[in-house]
Amino acid sequence: MEQTYQYAWIIPFLPLPVPMLIGAGLLLFPSATKSLRRMWAFQSVFLLSIVMLFSINLSIQQINGSSIYQYVWSWIINNDFSLEFGYLIDPLTSIMSILITTIGIMVLIYSDNYMSYDQGYLRFFAYMSFFSTSMLGLVTSSNLIQIYIFWELVGMCSYLLIGFWFTRPVAANACQKAFVTNRVGDFGLLLGILGFYWITGSFEFRDLFKILNNLISNNEVNFLFVTFCAVLLFAGAVAKSAQFPLHVWLPDAMEGPTPISALIHAATMVAAGIFLVARLIPLFIVIPHIMNFISLVGVITILFGATFALAQKDIKRGLAYSTMSQLGYMMLALGMGSYRSALFHLITHAYSKALLFLGSGSVIHSMETLVGYSPNKSQNMVFMGGLTKHVPITKTSFLLGTLSLCGIPPLACFWSKDEILNDTWLYSPIFAIIAWFTAGLTAFYMFRIYLLTFEGHLNVHFQNYSGKKNTPFYSISLWGKENSKRINKNFSLLTMKNPEIFSFFSKKTYQIDQNARNITQPFITITRFGNKKFFLYPYESDNTMLFPILVLVLFTLFVGSLGIPFNHEGVRLDILSKWLTPSINLLHKNLNNSIGWYEFLKDALFSVSIAIFGIFIAFFLYKPVYSSLQNWDLINSFVKTGPKRILLDKIINGIYDWSYNRGYIDAFYARFFIGGIRGLAKLTSFFDRRVIDGITNGVGVLSFFLGEGIKSIGGGRISSYLFLYFFFVAILLLIINFLLI
């Protein structure tokens, strides 16, 4: 066992040869390297598989032995200062290593086909392998200096991967936005590291925790300064894990290839912030008020992420805001001190979200057959619908991932999310209400994505389709196709160009009621299809892309069994608590995570009921168009014309605008921060050109005219020179005489 731990230093370096060899090959033998490019995918998967097996072996030993291993090399700079580099293997490290490697392998296998026609295939796999190296180095770091080094490498890799298609201006802007936003958090992280080194004199985690605990216990430290340094450390996690208010980069990061989105959102970049807070939780827990601040940021992020997801048309952006909200649950759990629940949700969410992103990639891949390579169209749920019969495997797997994220048993996220929701009641009733309300919103917007993508009819085949924002709220286009900002008097579901509406599945016609309002830009306009006789249809992805999806389905189905929170007749089912025993004991002595069947079912019933209610609302509003037409009278009966109806329209449109415009936070930053910085830059440029350059140029001009003036006095006569000489000497003597007197 000891020998296994001694070789754990190799974990972050095993994937590193791939980017190095690809770079050397492209530099020295470009033609041969490109011709053998599929070989590099195999090497990437093979090396990461070795790391996965090594990590699983370490995890099994930790579950059985509950041990923590740290190895350090000292680099002595002088007698007063030395840097120590090493690696730390504990339950948190092994959990993160398994997440990174398992999801990384699935993403690499998936990418082999997804990126097969891309000219940047080799560059993609080089970036991905280096991304894995950076993240593995981060989770095995034994001190804050190593954390920061690999933290920056993770940020650099995310910059390269988000801007992978850098020739597209949108992608180039997105990677710059992610880079700049994360620099704000990283600068805070660096200042926090330096601040705690100034307080404790150590970068090592164990020494840092021990020294700071003693200083606080003996009241030998300034609490305000310590809290400020802790907030700076937390700022790094806020930016990296897309927590409010540094979350604005996350939806724009969807401009990268879909496999990148899966890796970033499941197991690498956004997970790094959660990992950092979990790693430093023994430090945060002894600092007054910082845990409350962490939980506050988490609960705000939960609510904002869920509300922003309600009106997104881009399937990947909808999933991105879902990630933001779920990361908020993890941050809330860490702020409440629910260490186990946070890590449990990190595990379950990682596999479910990877499944959803790879499923969305399969959908996008199939839609490109119809709309061409245009992310604005292939990722737009407005053009989707009716994909169930075309991509049945993708549809089923996406449905399972959706149900998991909604918290439906016995899927993975149900077990972890339910624990966090129950813990919130013990911490704060206000936070609990927000968390439970957002759980219902999660079920609503996730099934909205599912229904708009897979149910109904394939909307791209309606040639007169218009996507402009003039569709009423109450139609099937609710917050997904488009919505009218105008408050009209009456209500209708769909408006055709003639008063007869045709059902998709029958020839029966439906007459529009006279009270129905007219829509200038319809959601779907059904007219004659002209001379077109053939349509292209989406197709299921091939086995190389389906295999990772099916493997992630298995994880989504069964990974929740790791943390089943009850034991039965001496059989300990809660493997996760046993796995985390060393870390949990550092935080809570003799903590018992097991509960009885009755208590578990009582708590679960309420959370599942809320999720089912959200799903029901989504089905009611987003079911296929023909069903909505048949239920038009039912919906109309609930919404009568009058002042209440107008007020309801205003509220609904306000919520839609808030969600569609991301809470106007991006606009606020653009106006006050970006606009302010640009204004300051223009002012500085004006001051530099007019004042600084003006003084410099003025001295030169003054010297020129002074020289010209003196030159005009001298005409070449020696008598004039002598006269001026004696004149100035006389004046100088008079001045000296005056000063001496």
Curated annotation (Swiss-Prot):
Cystines in this chain: none
A GO CC annotation given for this chain: chloroplast thylakoid membrane
A single GO molecular function term of this UniProt record: quinone binding
Main location: plastid
InterPro entries, sorted: NADH_UbQ_OxRdtase_chlpt_su5_C, NADHpl_OxRdtase_5_subgr, ND/Mrp_TM, NU5C-like, Proton_antipo_N
Enzyme class: translocase
Function in brief: NDH shuttles electrons from NAD(P)H:plastoquinone, via FMN and iron-sulfur (Fe-S) centers, to quinones in the photosynthetic chain and possibly in a chloroplast respiratory chain. The immediate electron acceptor for the enzyme in this species is believed to be plastoquinone. Couples the redox reaction to proton translocation, and thus conserves the redox energy in a proton gradient.
Name this protein carries in UniProt: NAD(P)H-quinone oxidoreductase subunit 5, chloroplastic
Source species: Daucus carota (Wild carrot)
This protein's encoding gene: ndhF
